[in-house]
């Protein structure tokens, strides 16, 4: 029997994990742009945190995004537990990881960062 409350909770945790992953990728992107092109008002880390995620600057300082990565893993684990408990099958827990990857790709694609990632590689 499917328990929809745990399934919805698992999907919510996967969405939060995907958002944390997108923040991590943005921090890596801005650090890489700074190393390659130097300081610019368009891609500085301080401008990014001031305009987009001011709360995160106080909670997660510029440490390369490692603390955001830890938060992402916590929400991925919660999503896996909720999704596996919702249907009593361990295979459904992989949905959380796949959804996290898809949501990350959506955020990166919607912000138009994929071309910049190709240039940095």
PLM regions: where:
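Catalytic phosphate/metal-binding cores of nucleic-acid and nucleotide-processing enzymes, i.e., regions
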Residues: 2-121
């Amino acid at each position: 029997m499917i328990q929809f409350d745990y399934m919805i909770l698992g999907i919510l945790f996967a969405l939060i994990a995907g958002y944390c992953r997108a923040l991590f990728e943005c921090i890596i992107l801005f650090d890489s742009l700074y190393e390659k092109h130097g300081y610019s008002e368009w891609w500085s880390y301080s401008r990014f945190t001031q305009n987009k995620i001011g709360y995160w600057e106080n909670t997660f300082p510029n440490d390369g995004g490692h603390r955001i990565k830890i938060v992402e893993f916590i929400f991925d684990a919660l999503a896996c537990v909720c999704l596996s408990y919702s249907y009593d099958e361990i295979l459904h827990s992989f949905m959380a990881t796949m959804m996290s990857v898809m949501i990350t790709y959506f955020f990166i694609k919607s912000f138009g960062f994929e071309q910049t990632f190709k240039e940095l590689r």
